[in-house]
Amino acid sequence: DNANGSVEVTTNALGDEIVKMLKQSSDFANHLASESSKLQSAVQNLTSSSNSQAASLEETAAALEEITSSMQNVSVKTSDVITQSEEIKNVTGIIGDIADQINLLALNAAIEAARAGEHGRGFAVVADEVRKLAERTQKSLSEIEANTNLLVQSINDMAESIKEQTAGITQINESVAQIDQTTKDNVEIANESAIISSTVSDIANNILE
């Protein structure tokens, strides 16, 4: 009887331990399943936000590309304007040479008219008017050249500014591309985490079963 009693006590104790272990396993499995569910939810949110961020970054990159393209077009136009300004300066130079020659001819005509005395008085008046016209032409040409120089300088400054801005936008675009790639990498990591979380959840459910 004592032996039977001892076996019964031992069996009961072992049964209690088994029940206790099963309860602990069940509690652990429930906790594991709960945490896995939370992890899956967090991963889904991360994936969704990462995809949205990636889409926004791609839109930003596209907009920056358009801005860069527009700036490059403006830079080309400014180069064209500078070329045309140089052509204007060349033309004003030619006109200036002609005005110098006219002024010299008017001076010679005035000298000849003075030598002619009374007979050359009318011619002298015409020569003086021609000289004044040549002087006004020279003055206007000087103003045109000065304004053209200012225009060219302003365009050069603008072109340099556009160049710097384009370089800055290019750097920003490169940074956006890097962030976009990092975001895509995060999405891949999140997807892998979701797979792991699902596997853990399955294990927890198997324990509960």
Where are these regions (language model features)?
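HAMP domain helices
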Residues: 1-56, 140, 147, 209
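Short alpha-helical "patches" and their helix-cap loops
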Residues: 24, 80-81, 194
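Core structural elements
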Residues: 35, 172-173
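Extended, amphipathic, non-transmembrane alpha-helical segments
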Residues: 38-40, 103-106
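Parallel, heptad-repeat alpha-helical coiled-coil signal-transduction segments
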Residues: 13-19, 51, 64-76, 80-104, ...
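Short, charged, amphipathic alpha-helical segments
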Residues: 57-61, 173, 194
